């Protein structure tokens, strides 16, 4: 019976994707009943960008399609509806079997025993954690220093965000307000409680805001597993996104965890055409209303109350 499903979305990641899968396999083989689900996100939008740039098509999908025939722990999936690693992850979860889910990018190296030890701990303590567990990160693969996230807010502008900060060591896992979804472990039940990532999310922005701050209003926690970091390879992938996509994704996240007013404040304070911005807002309020209603029915606090409990200032009434 599969215990752990490892979800790895990819778009223009070759050959780092192969090294990523290999490092995960080396970590788990013979130690955990696991599966690795790679999700190739080649789609018309990405194809058009790659043709325009003159870059070569990613070889990852062909490689993993062939490889899965000899490795029962590997599933090579394809998601081509739109360019979005959030939707690629949603699709992979729907095809997975594990009670526990671990998400990572296709450009990481897993340090020996880090993932195994984290999974061993999480399997024993997930009930008391009541939330997610994350490995610290190094942004560039050869860096020694470790990073986590810190909370960055300005509710007058609809900003509920994050940035990198220095990791602090500890003897056991500790709570933080937010953390990267690269290296994130959760139960399938928590994924279901979140409703998965909102189906309207595109390629960039919003996905981590959604996870962290929807967990917050649901009364769940975000936790760091101290020790070895997940070594991340920060680099360009040969594709891009535009500002409207980013605003839309952040607006989706704000709306789902914070409601109409928070989404509107965020849009009010963006630069650009007001007509375009408010068209984005209207579309988000229409297409994401079911997900917002789902979270609103189950939340135990508001994002404003949660921020106040962290000791951060709220805007004047």
Task: Report each predicted region and the residues it spans.
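Short, acidic, metal-binding catalytic loop of nucleotide-sugar glycosyltransferases
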Residues: 22-33
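A conserved acidic beta->alpha catalytic loop
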Residues: 38-63
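A recurrent flexible, glycine/aromatic-enriched loop bordering the glycosyltransferase active site
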Residues: 86, 166-185
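Short aromatic/hydrophobic "clamp" motif used to bind/position activated sugar donors
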Residues: 101
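The conserved acidic donor/metal-binding loop of glycosyltransferases
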Residues: 105-109
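Conserved donor NDP-sugar-binding/catalytic core segment of glycosyltransferases
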Residues: 113-156
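Terminal low-complexity segments of carbohydrate-biosynthetic enzymes
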Residues: 181, 242-317
